[in-house]
Amino acid sequence: MAGAEWKSLEECLEKHLPLPDLQEVKRVLYGKELRKLDLPREAFEAASREDFELQGYAFEAAEEQLRRPRIVHVGLVQNRIPLPANAPVAEQVSALHRRIKAIVEVAAMCGVNIICFQEAWTMPFAFCTREKLPWTEFAESAEDGPTTRFCQKLAKNHDMVVVSPILERDSEHGDVLWNTAVVISNSGAVLGKTRKNHIPRVGDFNESTYYMEGNLGHPVFQTQFGRIAVNICYGRHHPLNWLMYSINGAEIIFNPSATIGALSESLWPIEARNAAIANHCFTCAINRVGTEHFPNEFTSGDGKKAHQDFGYFYGSSYVAAPDSSRTPGLSRSRDGLLVAKLDLNLCQQVNDVWNFKMTGRYEMYARELAEAVKSNYSPTIVKE
């Protein structure tokens, strides 16, 4: 399996394909070619100083007579943990806060309106270990924990909606842990939260040792810049999960994730892009970067030898549009900020062309699914 030595699919294609072939391959892989954003020089200089990649692309819609363009700039942040996983908890959280603050400041230079961080961004992705301490100490209140207060300041200072995925401790309901994304308005107020609907039980993804499936449904958040939803990590494998956010009105669905190359890298470029097409919305897939080493060996009942790391988190964050176009991915090996300029009018324009909502036959599937979940259900199989 390729680790950090392989930088990106795009770099590989550009290195080995002649230009005419490259253009055709990119047309198939990424849809229509997107215009690169002319981001401020000082933003690139700051990104260079802070050692993270900066890219920007624009998705454009057709000009309309009655509606003005509905422009929003989104920012996707991918990063590695700056300190070893065995560093003191408070030091790790502080280091991650500092790292994210530096990246958000560059996002503000680029005019970003909505920014989203990776899944469980304030900690190592330690759920592979099945150990409780010290990892549960990273859990915080979604409403007024230190990370939420930190993000509220960022949001207010930069007039930016912040999507902050954390490990939540719900003190109002028995100190239960949840995998949660907090949505903070550009006013600095906590707009609400959403929880991970689907919890993996595959390989080293031992997450159900810590938290279970979310209980908040599929909320969509009305922000000044558009309607957004957050489909956390493993939920991207479930088409109905994307569908319900779309049915509830989401125009942009963020997918903050933590996933490794051995398991999912061949799925990664497809799933969020397919969801954007199927649901007439923009999708934003975000993954962390690097290999995280833990103090103690662990196993996962899959026959593999005991080991001390989860695997390689391959980054490659990207944005996909309802017309099937998508940005190139960020690096597989570096921290990065991807800025995308979206015209939300494209959602309705594509809907009018393909009519997936109109032709979806939801009433038929609702009826059949209602029968399928009954204990006495028999599949409809026609036999001779």
Swiss-Prot record:
Q: How is its activity regulated?
A: Strongly inhibited by 50 mM Zn(2+). Not inhibited by EDTA. Competitively inhibited by beta-alanine, 5-aminolevulinic acid (ALA), beta-aminoisobutyrate and 4-ureidobutyrate.
TM region(s), chain numbering: none
Cite the CDD domains for this sequence: ML_beta-AS (cd07587)
Q: What class of enzyme is it?
A: hydrolase
Q: Does the keyword Cell membrane apply?
A: no
The EC number of this protein is 3.5.1.6
Summary of pH dependence: Optimum pH is 6.5.
Q: Where is the CN hydrolase domain?
A: 72-344
Molecular-function annotations in GO: beta-ureidopropionase activity; protein homodimerization activity
- The catalytic site is made up of 119 (proton acceptor), 196 (proton donor), 233 (nucleophile)
Q: What is the reaction catalyzed? A: 3-(carbamoylamino)propanoate + H2O + 2 H(+) = beta-alanine + NH4(+) + CO2; 3-(carbamoylamino)-2-methylpropanoate + H2O + 2 H(+) = (R)-3-amino-2-methylpropanoate + NH4(+) + CO2
Homology family: Belongs to the carbon-nitrogen hydrolase superfamily. BUP family.
Disease involvement: Beta-ureidopropionase deficiency: An inborn error of metabolism due to a defect in pyrimidine degradation. It is characterized by muscular hypotonia, dystonic movements, scoliosis, microcephaly and severe developmental delay. Patients show strongly elevated levels of N-carbamyl-beta-alanine and N-carbamyl-beta-aminoisobutyric acid in plasma, cerebrospinal fluid and urine.
The entry's function note states: Catalyzes a late step in pyrimidine degradation. Converts N-carbamoyl-beta-alanine (3-ureidopropanoate) into beta-alanine, ammonia and carbon dioxide. Likewise, converts N-carbamoyl-beta-aminoisobutyrate (3-ureidoisobutyrate) into beta-aminoisobutyrate, ammonia and carbon dioxide.
Please identify the protein, giving its name as recorded.
Beta-ureidopropionase
Q: Which organism is it from?
A: Homo sapiens
High-level lineage:
Eukaryota, Metazoa, Chordata, Craniata, Vertebrata
